[in-house]
Amino acid sequence: MHTTYLKNLIGFESLTPQSNGAIEYIDDLLKEHGFKTEVKIFGETEQVTNLYAVYGNSKPNICFVGHVDVVPAGDPNLWHNSNPFKAHEQEGKIYGRGTVDMKGSIACFLAASLDFIKNNTDFVGSISFLLTSDEEGKAKHGTKEMLQYIYNQGHEIDFAIVGEPTCEKEIGDTIKIGRRGSINFKLAVKGLGGHVAYPQKANNPLPCLIRILNELTNIKLDKGTEFFQNSNLEVTNIDVDNNTTNVIPETATVHFNIRFNNLHSAETLAKQVEEIIKQHCQKHKLDYTLEYNSSADSFIQNPNDKIKEFATIVEKTLNIKPKFSTSGGTSDARFVKNYCPLVEFGLLSDTAHKINEYTKISDLQKLYDVYYNFLMETLNVTGSPPLLGMT
């Protein structure tokens, strides 16, 4: 059923922050199978649809956390079937926007949980879903707000699986247990414009900005840690608002981003960056403005018993030993980690957000097997059959 669920989910054009029927479809499906569900819409100007659904009323509560929203699909004519929101099956693969990020993992956990409930009437614990239509965007009224809401209602999650596409070369090779932080900067160096033939009557901000960027981009922030790669600064935009060749610009503006590990905080990095900027601007007798915003702090979890148990299930099911990682961008795991231990585990990440995003059907089966086996091992099923996928 996971392929059917995935094809149905691809059919909803759920561009951030719209559900466009995707969450409503899942809500109806889960209610049909005995889940207690609640759909909440948060936000005023951009309304975000969220779902919490739970089956059972005892501990432990194993929760799948995910998002139905997708990024724009680009030119539809570049897709195999010219319609990225109609699932296309070809040569053992399913194509469509959101296939790996992350409707495929939602489909797999849907199938695994419904099959588990059907096959096991004596389990101890609860299975739940927390889904949102805004993870790819601002993420203000999605998982973060829904977690606050359900905890205020008395719900508690004991362990979460975030279904982001984490695997690199094959299903099972990577489990994410943390994420890097992210901080964005906007620097405007303010000079005095003028004619290029009379530089003595102007103060060009560009030489100063070049020296600032040269120092910033050559800083070795750290050497990384056991689970984190080294922190990294990338320049993303430079603008002087000047297309004329004989005019010295008045202002030079640059945007840059730092992805940082747990050796830093947004505050310490901002202080370090501003010290460098201040020194150069004072030397060149220039003013500046600096704006920065951190969308996520870095975090890392110590692999506790439940995280290690999940890794063991992956290894037993797929005969591959997963590595713990913190690579990649930010995700809603940064909100979930404030409430419970978690793993991020899903499909391959290599086609996420790309034209002709796809997954192998065999990879869906592998992911389904891992999810199903984890439920079997965690929810105290007595007299259970051998784990799926094992030989």
Curated annotation (Swiss-Prot):
Cofactor: Zn(2+); Co(2+)
EC number per UniProt: 3.5.1.18
This protein's record includes keyword Oxidoreductase: no
UniProt xrefs under Gene3D superfamilies: 3.30.70.360, Zn peptidases
Subunit annotation: Homodimer.
Keywords in alphabetical order: Amino-acid biosynthesis, Cobalt, Diaminopimelate biosynthesis, Hydrolase, Lysine biosynthesis, Metal-binding, Zinc
Pathway(s) where this gene product acts: Amino-acid biosynthesis; L-lysine biosynthesis via DAP pathway; LL-2,6-diaminopimelate from (S)-tetrahydrodipicolinate (succinylase route): step 3/3
Residues involved in Zn(2+) 2 binding: D101, E136, H353
HAMAP family according to UniProt: DapE
NCBIfam families with a match to the protein in the record: dapE_proteo, PRK13009.1
Protein's UniProt name: Succinyl-diaminopimelate desuccinylase
Reactions catalysed according to its record: N-succinyl-(2S,6S)-2,6-diaminopimelate + H2O = (2S,6S)-2,6-diaminopimelate + succinate
Binding-site list for Zn(2+) 1: H67, D101, E164
Organism whose genome encodes this protein: Rickettsia bellii (strain RML369-C)
Molecular function (Gene Ontology), one example: acetylornithine deacetylase activity
Function: Catalyzes the hydrolysis of N-succinyl-L,L-diaminopimelic acid (SDAP), forming succinate and LL-2,6-diaminopimelate (DAP), an intermediate involved in the bacterial biosynthesis of lysine and meso-diaminopimelic acid, an essential component of bacterial cell walls.
Biological processes per GO annotation: diaminopimelate biosynthetic process; L-arginine biosynthetic process; lysine biosynthetic process via diaminopimelate
Family per record: Belongs to the peptidase M20A family. DapE subfamily.
Signal sequence bounds: none
InterPro entries the UniProt entry points to: ArgE/DapE_CS, Bact_exopeptidase_dim_dom, DapE_proteobac, Peptidase_M20, Peptidase_M20_dimer, Peptidase_M20A
Active-site feature positions: D69, E135 (proton acceptor)
Cofactor note (record): Binds 2 Zn(2+) or Co(2+) ions per subunit.
